[in-house]
C-alpha cells in the first residue's frame, strides 16, 4: 500500500525517523524527510534511494510554523499531495523536578513534542483530507502513565495524546485515520543522550543503558507500518504494555512498583 505514496516524516535524520524512512523507501514510498541537521538528512536520503524509494530533504525546525508550512509546500509541489504525515520529532528529559534549574526545559519539551506536531499537521491536514490519508503521531507509553524524572516529557506526550484523541473525533467521516503510537524505550536512537538534564544541557553519556525490555527501532517501525496498513488508531509497543492502562485503573500500587523498578534499573 505504500508504493507511490507521499510520506512526510519529521525527525527523520536519525533513530526511529530514519528507520521508518528506509523501511518506507524499500516499499517504494516517496519520502519527504524533515529535520534540522542537513548533513544527516542527506545521508538518509541516500539510504532511501539505495533502498529503492524516492526521497527529498527539507531542512527546518518543527517548532517554527513557517518552517512547517514550507515543508508541506515543498512536499506538495514535488509530489502533488501528501498521503501520510508521520510526526516523529521528539525531545526527552531525565531530571527530578526539584533538580531543574532552567524552567525553559518545560517550554522546549512542549514546543517540540506537542506544538511541533500541531504546527505540521495544521498545514498538512487539507492535503490529508484530500487523499483520505493517515496521521501518525509518535507519543510514548509515558503518555499513559506518569514516570519519575520525566515530568516535562510526560506532560508533553499527554498533551499530544489528548490532541490526537480530540482530532480523531473531528475527522470522523473524512477518511483520515489518526494513529497514536505508544512505544517503550527504543534502542538505536539518540533520545537518551540528547535528553534534557536539570540544567537544560543534554544528559550525554550519563544514561546510556537500555534494559532488556527496550525495543529496537526496526521492531518499532515494522509495527507502525502494519498499524498504518490496518488503519489502526492506537498502537502500544511491545504488546504486553497494553496491560498498563488496566493496571493503572485496577491495580495502581502494582503499576507504581513496576515503574520504580524500571527507573531504578535504568539509573544504575
Label each region the model flagged.
Residues 92-107, 149-152:
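Conserved mid-core segment of classical short-chain dehydrogenase/reductases
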Residues 173-239:
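SDR active-site lid
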Residues 140:
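Residue(s) in the substrate-gating loop at a strand-loop-helix junction
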Residues 38, 59-70, 103:
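The beta1-alpha1 cofactor-binding region of Rossmann-like NAD(H)/NADP(H)-dependent oxidoreductases
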Residues 121, 156:
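Active-site helix of classical SDR
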Residues 13-14:
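Conserved glycine-rich cofactor-binding loop
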Residues 27-44:
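Conserved glycine-rich Rossmann-like NAD(P)H-binding loop of the short-chain dehydrogenase/reductase
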